[in-house]
Amino acid sequence: MASNLPVRSFSEVCCAEARAAIIQMENNPDETVCNRIWKIHRDLQSSDLTTTVQVMMVYRFISKRVPEGCFAILSGVNTGMYNPRELKRSYVQSLSSGTSCEFLRSLDKLAKNLLAVHVCSDVKMSLNKRQVIDFISGEEDPTLHTAEHLTSLALDDSPSAVVYSGWQQEAIKLHNTIRKIATMRPADCKAGKFYSDILSACDQTKELLDAFDQGKLAYDRDVVLIGWMDEIIKIFSKPDYLEAKGVSYQVLKNVSNKVALLRESI
């Protein structure tokens, strides 16, 4: 599906601070030129981590080379709360399952930048243009992301073109995201019940929404979605949650926090 969407240039989707450097590399992909641009940004103390990471990723894609000294940009950055190996493993798994866009959007900025550095430093890992676009594009414009994310704005296999308004739209996005991340649990995960409870809550919610759309329920979507949020909040308060470690813990925690904030706002 993603291949049917137009792939925009890197300079159209990157942050404003990285745009000039990325335009230079796009217009003149000569290795010497790109290498000079990368090293300037790598050593530029005034450049923030996100800007440098975006320049690094475009350099990696154009040159097909591991950026020299790429780990230097993490100097002084506290990344101890993340396990880079687990982070990259989950990303590779999301590529295989077609959920990489949702996975990246569920990470906070630091985790995403840390993952980018480790992806770019892996000589065995190739990057296509769509992957780089998904890493560097901003969250404010959903048209920059893959078709998988666009279709996640409504429940899968919905029997009609349902329009969700206000907070319902955000709740649906969170529902789809948390379900897809929960399906990516590691095979050796000890928190099996935790993940199963999440999937069960999401599946039951989809069934109820489908039934409502078909006129089989007397109550409305508000009741269904609020009930789902309450159930997710309850699941994350149980001891089983403590067994979810590594990137699964970080990602699901971020999404569950968004669920809790949305619930409080209603």
UniProtKB/Swiss-Prot annotation:
Primary location group: virion
GO CC, any one term: virion component
Any GO molecular function: structural constituent of virion
Keywords of the record: Viral matrix protein, Virion
Domain of life, source organism: Viruses
Pfam short name (any one): Mx_ML
Keyword set includes Mitochondrion: no
Compartment(s): Virion
Physiological role: plays a role in virion budding and release by presumably binding the ribonucleocapsid and the host membrane.
Name by which UniProt lists this protein: Matrix protein
Organism name: Thogoto virus (isolate SiAr 126) (Tho)
Classification of source organism: Viruses, Riboviria, Orthornavirae, Negarnaviricota, Polyploviricotina
